[in-house]
Amino acid sequence: MNIAKLIDHTILKANTTKEDVMKVIEEAKEYKFASVCINPTWVKLAAEELAGHDVDVCTVIGFPLGASTTETKAFETKDAIAKGATEVDMVINVGALKDGDDELVEKDIYEVVQAAKGKALVKVIIETCLLTDEEKVRACELSVKAGADFVKTSTGFSTGGATAEDIALMRKTVGPNVGVKASGGVRTREDAEKMVAAGASRVGASASVAIVLNDAKGATDNY
């Protein structure tokens, strides 16, 4: 298995410096990761540095709480794409989902999908650690209905990360034609392979180099 091509090499910490981002970009070039996943402020730099390399530029929208307005999320998406993003990972309105306001949740995702149409993949972060299984299923169903390309477990900034059980449930819910991304707490090759076996088609990690080299000692969390 070419695990590198399934990994979004991630650095999203608030104190990330340009030097940190450049290191992630160089590692992505060297190990040929699927993408670098960075905060919006770094998109332009990453797009310039990765031009001509087979590495996508992924950024985050409404991150990490998902509590921005729909209009803000749509604007963030357009702005990120204009600066060179080719993938966007958006956070759903978790509170609206818990309130049973499925219409708002779906519209929120739909507007981001429309803003990205034909220009960037949309991955929908449902923040599994805050949801019941029934809510996880609903979040996945609404994501598919709204036209998302992927559903994703976690921001890495809440109370928990990806589990194989959640990945299996999400895969079962979305079917074979929508991607499932495991993120949050994936630090070893064994972790990554467990997620893929459960149904993940992409893995978000900051310990990506350690995962590829199968080196548990090198694993750190940059979420």
Curated annotation (Swiss-Prot):
Q: Which reaction does it catalyse?
A: 2-deoxy-D-ribose 5-phosphate = D-glyceraldehyde 3-phosphate + acetaldehyde
Q: Does the keyword Cytoplasm apply?
A: yes
Q: Does the record's keyword annotation contain Lyase?
A: yes
- Entry keywords, A to Z: Cytoplasm, Lyase, Schiff base
Can you tell me which residues form the catalytic site? D89 (proton donor/acceptor), K152 (schiff-base intermediate with acetaldehyde), K181 (proton donor/acceptor)
Can you tell me where the transmembrane regions are?
A: none
Question: Which pathway?
Answer: Carbohydrate degradation; 2-deoxy-D-ribose 1-phosphate degradation; D-glyceraldehyde 3-phosphate and acetaldehyde from 2-deoxy-alpha-D-ribose 1-phosphate: step 2/2
Molecular function GO terms recorded: deoxyribose-phosphate aldolase activity
Annotated InterPro entries: Aldolase_TIM (IPR013785), DeoC (IPR011343), DeoC/FbaB/LacD_aldolase (IPR002915), DeoC_typeI (IPR028581)
GO terms of biological process kind: 2-deoxyribose 1-phosphate catabolic process; carbohydrate catabolic process; deoxyribonucleotide catabolic process
Q: Gene3D superfamilies per the record? A: Aldolase class I
Q: What class of enzyme is it?
A: lyase
- Any coiled-coil regions, as ranges: none
Q: Where in the cell is it found?
A: Cytoplasm
Offer a single GO CC term for the protein: cytoplasm
Q: Sum up the protein's function in the record's words.
A: Catalyzes a reversible aldol reaction between acetaldehyde and D-glyceraldehyde 3-phosphate to generate 2-deoxy-D-ribose 5-phosphate.
Concerning its family, UniProt says: Belongs to the DeoC/FbaB aldolase family. DeoC type 1 subfamily.
Q: What is the official name of this protein in its record?
A: Deoxyribose-phosphate aldolase
**Could you tell me which species this protein originates from?**
Bacillus cereus (strain ATCC 10987 / NRS 248)
